[in-house]
Amino acid sequence: SGYVIKFTNGLTVYLSGDTGIHTEMKSVVGDFHKANLVLLNYGSSAISAYSATYAMNELIKPSAVIATHVNERATTSGKLRPESRTAALVKMQKRPVHLAISGRTMEFDGKANCVAGCN
């Protein structure tokens, strides 16, 4: 399931929560709400880089993704570790993937372009 939040600047965010990949991601989140930014909880062992990539590239098709709740040491000093599951996800995406880094605030415009706080 998850949550959809719409902001007054036009940004529509889908918070996946701990949900798995499901067909409503296309019909409800992608087609109806037209989410342009997804906060993808990627830590579950049930969600592989391949299934998450399919959900983002084929079902929701957001402008950008924030990988969160990854349950691994995906970064060192704020930089992506190339051997991580998260790095595999980033390589397969057709859109920018931003990393949720503790203490870092990210700002997005209405089209899900990161305007501050992203690398």
Q: What feature does the model see in each segment?
A:
Residues 31-39, 43:
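Active-site metal-binding motif and surrounding structural segment of the metallo-beta-lactamase
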Residues 1-30, 102-119:
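Core dinuclear metal-dependent hydrolase active-site scaffold
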Residues 43-49, 74-77:
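Acidic-and-aromatic substrate-binding clefts and catalytic sites of carbohydrate-active enzymes
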Residues 17-19, 42-44, 70:
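Active-site metal-binding loops of divalent metal-dependent hydrolases
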Residues 21-26, 48-56:
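Alpha-helical scaffolding within the catalytic cores
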Residues 14-15, 40, 67, 99:
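Structural beta-sheet core signal
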Residues 29, 54-119:
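Binuclear metal-ion centers of metallo-dependent hydrolases, dominated by the metallo-beta-lactamase
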Residues 11-13, 37, 64:
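Structural motif
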